[in-house]
Amino acid sequence: MSEKVLELRDVTMQFGGVVAVNNLSMEVRKGEIVSLIGPNGAGKTTVFNVITGVYVPTNGEVLLDDKVVVAGHPKGKMKKLYNGENAGKYTRMITKTPDKITRLGVARTFQNIRLFKSMTVFENVLVAKHMTRTSNVFSATFRLNHKEEEQMRKDTLELLKIVGLEAEKDELATSLPYGKQRRLEIARALATKPKFLLLDEPAAGMNPQETDELTAFIHDIRKTFDLTILLIEHHMNLVMDISDRIYVVDFGKLIASGTSDVIQKDKKVIDAYLGVVEDE
């Protein structure tokens, strides 16, 4: 069995009196495409925000390659050392910030496309490459020598070839058809050279042809870049076709997990999310 790239252990995320994620445990192994599905408001994007260090969980841990990178309140032996007011110290000591998690090889896309509207396709990807080298745009732009800059430009062009956007490299990002804007956002994530890619509703707003193309594209990039992928998606044909395994959450709580065949037959999943499939 391949090694774990991601593991969530008993993760809870509470906002005041609202429990967005409720004692969730899950794992993703190297090379897998795993989907996280559930109704709107089930806590899926909150899970992504916990994994990437945007949110610090109320309880639980996130592990990347078997190392804790995000932690809520301490447990076990650590609870004795860091109790009361010291619990916050433990969390600050363990939890990585989003930029540090990115440097560990994690990249994500968002439900709402976040491209630089005034930049070309090429520039959007080039900026993503720059940001992996230094901490801000200013230093990324002005501290590269000519040789490094030229190599980044070559790498950017090569990536655009791989993802099928070379012909559009000089077009403004916002001038692209919607499906290609989604592809560009994924290309920006790939520019950071991740080993673990999180896709938040990549098929949102796509027509059937674009969705079919996206399905093939995700398969291709997994193979080409040796990726492990976790995705949130409401498009069930895509989910069932592409996923090695599926986790289903409802009101932040895990209600089922397994292969697509198992999930499609699970009564709790049908009742909560998929709906009743009528006999033909």
Residue ranges and their predicted role:
Residues 2-280:
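Glycine-rich phosphate-binding loops of nucleotide-dependent enzymes
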